[in-house]
């Protein structure tokens, strides 16, 4: 019988990412999960020989990823982490995930990471991480083909776009090879400085054009606090913009992540329904998998 991890109502921090991160409305571009991700297939994104992107193969590499997560989420963003071990960001899902890391070949330092929960692992655990924040009942029909992304972060000194680009190319290559056409994740909008005004305004701005059909909508377990006023939202954070350009849908209202003082927007990307220019790139990755 599968061991079920009962979803706690403790939220995480900001993606797809994160998927996972937090800051004020005037400093969104400094957020690690919102490093520019314009086109993971573009020709000029040639391999950066200083950086190596790979799936972690041993515990030391996974520990390095957890230390990076702690430095970004706790030290930089002030999140309240409850992993139980000082200096590490970890939870009960980590043991069941594949961990993608980017290392600097000149130093050996891990400078970027993402984690991926595959459908088979989610079945063993009994839930996805997103189940701790949302009621995912309406996604049950696609769960056998749905992988979940999260805990993404990049070292502050490497936020040029190369790290996140390399990770996304590998994530897409892997998911194509493994037959995971649906990618579930969250993009996070900070609430620390404005109490949620930006998050509410983004929801009102984006829901009319980017909300998934009712059959795929999910519901937050902890909704955002109500507001007496809002404002015209600026452009969405870069990571969210990238997802939307690739055809991702917002699955419902954001959840309130108390630990990270942030709003998590649930998003779903269907690799079989990408815009034409992305489909061409995906076909290139598919040939690489043959």
Question: Regions from the language model: what does each represent?
Answer:
Residues 2-59:
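Conserved N-terminal entry element of GNAT/NAT acetyltransferase domains
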Residues 41-111, 115-120:
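Short amphipathic alpha-helix that is part of the acyltransferase structural core
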Residues 84-93, 191-192, 257-264:
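Beta-rich nucleic-acid/ligand-interaction surfaces
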Residues 90-91, 197-201, 265-269:
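Short low-complexity, flexible loop/linker segments enriched in glycine and/or proline
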Residues 109, 275-279:
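Short, conserved charged micro-motifs
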Residues 119-248, 254-255, 261-262:
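Acyl-donor binding region in acyl/amide transferases
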Residues 260-274:
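C-terminal "cap" of GNAT-fold acetyltransferases
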Residues 285-290:
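Short, cationic low-complexity segments
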């Amino acid at each position: 019988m599968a061991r079920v991890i009962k979803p706690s109502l403790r939220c995480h921090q900001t993606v797809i990412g994160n998927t996972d991160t937090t800051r004020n409305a005037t400093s969104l571009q400094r957020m690690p999960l919102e490093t520019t991700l314009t086109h993971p297939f573009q020709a000029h994104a040639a391999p950066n020989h200083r950086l190596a992107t790979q799936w972690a193969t041993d515990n030391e590499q996974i520990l390095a990823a957890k230390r990076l997560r702690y430095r970004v989420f706790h030290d930089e963003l002030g999140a309240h982490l409850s992993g139980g071990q000082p200096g590490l960001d970890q939870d009960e899902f980590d043991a069941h995930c594949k961990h993608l890391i980017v290392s600097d070949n000149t130093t050996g330092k891990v400078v970027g990471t993402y984690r991926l929960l595959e459908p088979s692992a989610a079945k063993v655990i009994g839930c996805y991480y997103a189940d701790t924040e949302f009621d995912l009942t309406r996604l049950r029909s696609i769960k056998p083909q749905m992988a979940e992304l999260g805990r993404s972060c990049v070292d502050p000194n490497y936020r040029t776009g190369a790290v996140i680009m390399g990770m996304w190319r590998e994530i897409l290559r892997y998911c194509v090879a493994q037959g995971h056409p649906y990618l579930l994740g969250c993009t996070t909008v900070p609430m620390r400085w404005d109490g949620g005004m930006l998050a509410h305004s983004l929801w009102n701005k984006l829901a009319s054009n980017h909300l998934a059909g009712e059959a795929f909508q999910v519901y937050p377990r902890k909704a955002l606090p109500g507001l007496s006023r809002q404002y015209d939202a600026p452009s969405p954070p870069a990571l969210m913009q990238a997802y939307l350009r690739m055809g991702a849908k917002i699955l419902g209202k954001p959840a309130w992540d108390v630990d990270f003082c942030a709003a998590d927007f649930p998003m779903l990307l269907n690799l079989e329904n990408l815009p034409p220019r992305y489909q061409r790139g995906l076909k290139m990755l598919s040939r690489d998998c043959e």
